[in-house]
Amino acid sequence: TWWCLLRPGKKTLQGGTFGIDREYSAEVLNAGENGNYRVRFHPVRDESVIDLSERLGVMPLPPYIDRTIDDPRSANDNERYQTVYADYDKRVAVAAPTAGLHFTPDLLADLEARGAQFHDLTLQVGIGTFHPIQVDNILDHNIHREWYEIPAAAFQSLQQPSPGPRVAVGTTSVRSIEDAMRRTRTAPETCLTPVGSVQAEADIFIYPPAGFEAVDALITNFHLPKSTLLCLVSAFLSPGDQRGIEWLLALYAEAIEHNYNFYSYGDAMLIV
């Protein structure tokens, strides 16, 4: 079974089934949180649900990117809205970690030639990343969970002195790393695997005046208004105090003044 976003969700749940003739049928089993529905798929062909979706589906872009199936730009989205280092055997995230979209194979090779070391994480970016804060006090916001895996070698590197600054690519990477550092310190039995990797659901909400244990610099795009990611970025701008909020507003004002591109296909900033 799969957790899916359905449109229209409630009406589909009442009907119980949907599908495409000679391709697949699907049963809607129950509703979950954040607009998710648990669905069991029955492909007509002998193929996996992932292969079925690759063959019939289109790239699930964020809701603020307006595309139709016949839009000529849609053909490029399959390549553009995916990092060059994505693991195709672990395709369950609802969105790309968009800070990584700026990297090309040539850029990665150039950075490695200059001495940079890379560690890959598995990030299952969740639909909650798009949910805005809708309360007056951020402490009342119900933060979303996102599953992640940090391989053993990467986690060992995080625990040792670094020869240079540790640069996280994207806010989801920061959240996962900081969650892992705290979780392995307080309850390692809940997340450490026998081979030394870390697997868990990040459930921490990072906002000023939070500090950071294992990340020294951050590459991140420009985010949506009222996003929890803005809270994380403002904390990262000035760890341990509230000054990052004012700095973040100034940075975004400058970006608007100079016509920077925002959101998934937009520009990025490097915070050191």
Map each language-model feature to its residues.
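Surface-exposed, charge/polar-rich loops and edge strands
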Residues: 1-272
